Amino acid sequence: MVFRAPLDFISASRLLLPHFADAPPVLSRSRSPEHPPAGFLSLALPGLCFSATQIASVCETLEETGDIERLARFLWSLPVNTDGRDSISEHESVQRARAVVAFHTGCYRELYRILETHRFTRASHSKLQAMWLEAHYREAEKLRGRPLGPVDKYRVRKKFPLPRTIWDGEQKTHCFKERTRGLLREWYLQDPYPNPGKKRELAHATGLTPTQVGNWFKNRRQRDRAAAAKNRLQHHRICPDSACTLSGGDSSERADGDTFLSVTDSDSDLDV
């Protein structure tokens, strides 16, 4: 039997395999998607003929709809090609679907194996990178018994860098690509306190959210103020007499107001 449309499979499966869609949940975080439970092999589809394109389309549709249970059942029903030629499992949509199922079932070892051994196209990178990082975050949280803070997540990212199979090789810092950070720095030099409109414009230009843009500017202002305070302290230690100190000691800013930012300025991001 050959299906004209990918989702014809789902309708046909209800007739040929009544329990395919209505079977009780079989996914658990302790079971690998590569090893279905006992008796589950009866869900294989003898006599049904799918093209590789149709199988890929079914995987993509079920992935997009978020139906992980049915996606897992469909993957387990696929035949195993033992001769290694034109294997269905080598199709990117099938590999990505297996990675999605492994992630949602907590089979992180299997997820890492899939991501490290199959080279994915750029279109899949963003989603797979997010799964790679989130899986490592969850494992670290479970090991430490507490939620991870920003520094903890940074250390996890340094310990488990993205594999080149899901990464284009461009250097990243705090998950922002270098070209994104360069654009942020250019705007910061022009205006370290962008209004909501400018934040939205910059967010559109960088692919970030307005909140991410606002947080980056806030953190950059804090770092600049800390560096300015350190420089003033070092200057005071070198020239302790009043002649060398900055004029207007009760002010937290330089007289020109350009070199240092005021510590009293608001860093609120409520206007995002």
UniProtKB/Swiss-Prot annotation:
Gene3D superfamilies: Homeodomain-like. Residues 244-272 are annotated as: Disordered. GO terms for molecular function: DNA-binding transcription activator activity, RNA polymerase II-specific; DNA-binding transcription factor activity, RNA polymerase II-specific; RNA polymerase II cis-regulatory region sequence-specific DNA binding; transcription corepressor binding. Pfam families: Homeodomain, SIX1_SD. GO terms for cellular component: nucleus; transcription regulator complex. Transmembrane segments: none annotated. The keyword Cell cycle does not apply. Keywords: Developmental protein, DNA-binding, Homeobox, Nucleus, Repressor, Transcription, Transcription regulation. InterPro entries: HD, Homeodomain-like_sf, SIX1_SD. SMART domains: HOX (SM00389). It is found in: Nucleus. PROSITE patterns: HOMEOBOX_2 (PS50071). Its main location: nucleus. GO terms for biological process: apoptotic process involved in development; cell proliferation in forebrain; epithelial cell maturation; eye development; forebrain dorsal/ventral pattern formation; lens development in camera-type eye; lens fiber cell apoptotic process; lens fiber cell differentiation. Transcriptional regulator which can act as both a transcriptional repressor and activator by binding a ATTA homeodomain core recognition sequence on these target genes. During forebrain development represses WNT1 expression allowing zona limitans intrathalamica formation and thereby ensuring proper anterio-posterior patterning of the diencephalon and formation of the rostral diencephalon. Acts as a direct upstream activator of SHH expression in the rostral diencephalon ventral midline and that in turn SHH maintains its expression. Belongs to the SIX/Sine oculis homeobox family. This is Homeobox protein SIX3. The gene is six3.
